[in-house]
From Swiss-Prot:
Top-level taxonomic group: Bacteria
Function: Essential for the assembly of the photosystem I (PSI) complex. May act as a chaperone-like factor to guide the assembly of the PSI subunits.
Source organism: Trichodesmium erythraeum (strain IMS101)
Annotated signal sequence range: none
Main localization (coarse): membrane
Gene coding for it: ycf3
Name of protein: Photosystem I assembly protein Ycf3
A GO biological process held by the record: photosynthesis
InterPro entries for the chain: PSI_Ycf3_assembly, TPR-like_helical_dom_sf, TPR_rpt, Ycf3/AcsC/BcsC/TPR_MFPF
């Protein structure tokens, strides 16, 4: 049974009904509609913590979707799942693929920065300050890019950049 037929959450049901109406009204081809249905089911499964099911749906959507912008969001969500599972290398691969399809995706840049910052903290805990600084510098570069695309977001990152001396601006927003 498709996920959309067994959804008990009112908000998810409402989203599904609206998405189905939009799909029926918009002039798109059947492949695009099918890709969106898989994407929608992937988002629903991901929201429920059903990551294996979400990945299956996202991979199906990815096989069907041609639009680079839409592909970027599918790839981004796959990256989110890998990051949630602690699979940071895989998450980085998918975030970078998302950026190849859509370079103006600050959330992917932010998540890459978060992974490098995490790695920096881990290196710092083990006393490896050289690696820690390298990871922190990489995090800073990605956060600067994310902030340049979304200057009113990522306030904590902006503060971190400023307090660590990695910011070349006084205030980003």
């Amino acid at each position: 049974m498709p996920r959309t037929q067994r959804n008990d959450n009112f908000i998810d049901k409402s989203f599904t009904v609206m998405a189905d109406l939009i799909l029926k009204l918009l002039p798109t081809n059947n492949q695009a509609k099918e890709a969106f249905a898989y994407y929608r089911d992937g988002m629903s499964a991901q929201a429920d913590g059903e990551y294996a099911e979400a990945l299956e749906n996202y991979y199906e959507a990815l096989n069907l979707e041609d639009d680079p912008n839409d592909r970027s969001y599918i790839l981004y969500n796959i990256g989110l799942i890998h990051a949630s599972n602690g699979e940071h290398d895989q998450a980085l691969e998918y975030y970078h693929q998302a950026l190849e399809n859509n370079p103006r995706m600050p959330q992917a840049l932010n998540n890459i920065a978060v992974i490098f910052h995490y790695r920096g903290e881990k290196a710092k805990e083990t006393g490896n300050s050289r690696d820690a600084n390298s990871y922190f510098d990489q995090a800073a570069e990605y956060w600067k890019q994310a902030i340049s695309l979304a200057p009113n977001n990522y306030i904590e990152a902006q503060n971190w950049l400023k307090t660590t001396g990695r910011s070349n601006k006084e205030v980003f927003f």
